[in-house]
From Swiss-Prot:
Chain residues that bind [4Fe-4S] cluster 1: 12, 15, 18, 160
Subcellular compartments: Periplasm
Induction: The trimeric FdhABC(3) complex is the main formate dehydrogenase enzyme in the presence of molybdenum.
Subunit description: Heterotrimer of cytochrome c3 FDH2C and formate dehydrogenase FDH2 alpha and beta subunits that forms the FdhABC(3) complex.
One family name in Pfam for this protein: Fer4_11
Activity versus pH, per record: Optimum pH is 9.5.
Annotated binding of [4Fe-4S] cluster 2, by residue: 22, 141, 144, 156
Domain 4Fe-4S ferredoxin-type: 3-32, 132-171
Cofactor dependency: [4Fe-4S] cluster
Lineage: Bacteria, Pseudomonadati, Thermodesulfobacteriota, Desulfovibrionia, Desulfovibrionales
Protein name: Formate dehydrogenase 2 subunit beta (cytochrome c-553)
Cellular component terms per the entry's GO annotation: formate dehydrogenase complex; periplasmic space
Source organism (scientific name): Nitratidesulfovibrio vulgaris (strain ATCC 29579 / DSM 644 / CCUG 34227 / NCIMB 8303 / VKM B-1760 / Hildenborough)
GO terms of molecular function: 4 iron, 4 sulfur cluster binding; metal ion binding
Cofactor note: Binds 3 [4Fe-4S] clusters.
Length: 219
């Protein structure tokens, strides 16, 4: 049975523990960044940050400042278009693991031409893949494939202190998502699940997706 994540943003405090744990587990170096007037750091996904917590600050109709936090990562699509696009250029550059549902960029992705690698990245409806300028490989969340294959949770899920993130069999996560949604609606009437049928990373949002991030949802 394929796996799935549930990311309940109503519980997220933007501690960024998931973001840091991901870097540590994948042994990725620190990024040198500059203050841009936002708490979001780094400003975007990059080859050294496969997961980031996005910050969206706005003022509601009552003049109250509202924060919306969005832990962004690859959605591990049920039907990943990135795999199809990559296969047309270099078969096996991107694959989907049948057992877990993880969408993975392999070492063959370094053989993609710059134009083909760009096409793979631009095919993603969630703007996830990045191209490592040093290795030329496509980089993105790999569902902690090594950990999951060994029966462990992804490191971001294990690290999360608030229960924002959950991981398990897809059917179990769908059931948990519906349960969490029912609870969230008692506090957030506009709460909803995003692109449930199309992805393996199910987001529960308290408000419209536009209040989180441009690519928070596709449908």
């Amino acid at each position: 049975m394929p796996k799935a994540f549930l990311i309940d943003t109503t519980r997220c405090t933007a501690c960024r523990g998931c973001q840091l744990a991901c870097k540590e587990w994948h042994d990725l170096p620190a990024n040198v960044t500059k203050q841009r007037g936002s708490h979001q750091n780094p400003p975007d996904l990059n080859p050294n940050n496969l997961k980031i917590v996005r910050f969206n600050e706005r003022m509601n109709e009552k003049g109250v400042v509202i924060w919306n936090f969005f832990p962004d990562q690859c959605r591990h699509c049920v039907t990943p278009v990135c795999v199809d696009v990559a296969d047309m250029a270099v078969p096996g550059a991107m694959i989907k693991d049948k057992k877990t549902g993880a969408v993975l960029a392999t070492e063959k992705s370094a053989k993609l031409s710059p134009a083909d690698a760009k096409a793979v990245a631009e095919a993603c409806p969630y703007n996830i893949p990045r191209i490592d300028p040093k290795t030329k490989r496509i980089t993105k969340c790999d569902m902690c494939f090594d950990r999951v294959s060994a029966g462990m949770q992804p490191i971001c899920v294990k690290t999360c202190p608030t229960g924002t993130m959950a991981f398990g069999e897809r059917d179990e996560m769908l059931a948990l998502a519906e349960k969490r949604l029912a609870d969230a609606k008692t506090r957030f009437p506009k709460a909803h699940l995003v692109d449930v049928e199309d992805v393996s990373v199910i987001y529960l949002l308290a408000e419209e997706k536009e209040h989180y991030y441009e690519y928070a949802g596709f449908m």
